[in-house]
Amino acid sequence: MNFKSTIGLEVHFELKTKSKIFSPSPVTYGAEQNTETNVIDWAMPGTLPMVNKNVYRLGIMVALATHSHILPTTHFDRKNYFYPDNPKAYQITQFFQPLARDGYIEVEVRGKKKRIGIHEMHIEEDAGKNTHGTNGYSYVDLNRQGVPLLEVVSEPDMEDPEEAYAYLEKLRKIVQFTGASDVKMEEGSMRVDTNISIRPAGQKELGTKVEMKNLNSFDHVRRSLAYEEKRQEQVLLAGGHIQLSTRRFDEATGKTVLERVKEGASDYRYFPEPDIAPDHISQEWIDQIAKELPKSPFDRYDDYVNKFGLKPYDANVLLQTKESSDFFDAAVAAGADPTLAANWMNTQVNGYLNDNRVSLEDIKLTPENLAKMIKLIQDGTISSKIAKKVFAETVANGTDPKKYVEDNGMVQLSDTSVLEPMVKKVVDDNPQSVEDFKNGKDRAIGFLVGQIMKQTRGKANPKMVNKLLNQELQSR
């Protein structure tokens, strides 16, 4: 018997704001427990929420980038439940009138394009964090309470784990390049819940849904869905039935584990939030935000390949993060050759970042200085070997490349009036190499170049030396 899967995803993005959604408390990842809270976050009597309007702006950016319909009027609702990390005993979210509906993302899987619908996206506040100690006590940290979230709910349009993976990859890149979120799963600024059901092929009625929450990597999403497909198939083939339930993914075993069985849909007794008035989102404001929307990663890819002539692989490496793409764009705008800039970004810069476990914002290299260094290579002022020393200094201290080269006597020797006598002497002193060259041994010229480089302590222009050596050897 063949089965068909139906998969839906709910993705929470932490919006990149300086303060929380309903209070002026700052938002800083990794801050000491309960140091970024105030009376609103603690739900003290008499306190009222104040909406951070920047949350709407960031949400609208994502809505525009995913072809979603932005509702002209939106308001907040209360989702009622009790938990220690939720001091109000309700969460402020959007249930009846979300920010946007009816969007889509196009993905390509196994060479075929498919449109995945977005049911809705809504804004809500995050809850605090519970920590259970080994001493029998539990601790509550409310730094995260009130951090703004954008939840993007897909339609159940995905039919296998690979489609879900492709959807997540594309959604993550779209959100990242709008600047609405930094989408760092390791810091919790992107979290994924999945639901999956299977049914016999040809059956129209959907099967019973199983949820998996807070999956912390794309790989876990793919592996958990693949396992759950097989598990549900085995249950049905054995004559059993699927329970409406929530399961978690066990990374060590690669299996999903039952957490709780549901008897029906949860009743959170949603009702409109009485302390926040409905908000009207004007078309004028939407149009203004659309003008501010950064260029999408897909448009950038077209520019990199078709305008700058980069290889698709190099373009994709640059587009792994918005920071990398922005840095490259700024370097090219400052006059860097696009191909050389991409090569330096994808090798030396990324290598340094990976080796030192830092990001572009942590180092002192600027796009302008990278462009200056590339120009020094292009005009023959320094060799690629010297450039690596210049790069190390510029990354560490932000030193101007041109000044550093001049102050340290690193200017490449390209003067033919100086190099020609050296070339003639090296050729005269190495008759065996001349004979080897005439016999077609390419290594001979490499040896001679090495002798020149040794005499000049690496300052001779290798291209110029090669050219002069070839001319001299051909004349013998």
Swiss-Prot record:
GO terms for biological process: glutaminyl-tRNAGln biosynthesis via transamidation; translation. It comes from the Bacteria. The keyword Nucleotide-binding applies. SUPFAM superfamilies: GatB/YqeY motif (SSF89095), Glutamine synthetase/guanido kinase (SSF55931). Pfam families: GatB_N (PF02934), GatB_Yqey (PF02637). One of its GO terms (molecular function) is asparaginyl-tRNA synthase (glutamine-hydrolyzing) activity. The keyword GTP-binding does not apply. Keywords: ATP-binding, Ligase, Nucleotide-binding, Protein biosynthesis. Belongs to the GatB/GatE family. GatB subfamily. HAMAP family: GatB (MF_00121). Allows the formation of correctly charged Asn-tRNA(Asn) or Gln-tRNA(Gln) through the transamidation of misacylated Asp-tRNA(Asn) or Glu-tRNA(Gln) in organisms which lack either or both of asparaginyl-tRNA or glutaminyl-tRNA synthetases. The reaction takes place in the presence of glutamine and ATP through an activated phospho-Asp-tRNA(Asn) or phospho-Glu-tRNA(Gln). This is Aspartyl/glutamyl-tRNA(Asn/Gln) amidotransferase subunit B. It comes from Lactobacillus acidophilus (strain ATCC 700396 / NCK56 / N2 / NCFM). The gene is gatB.
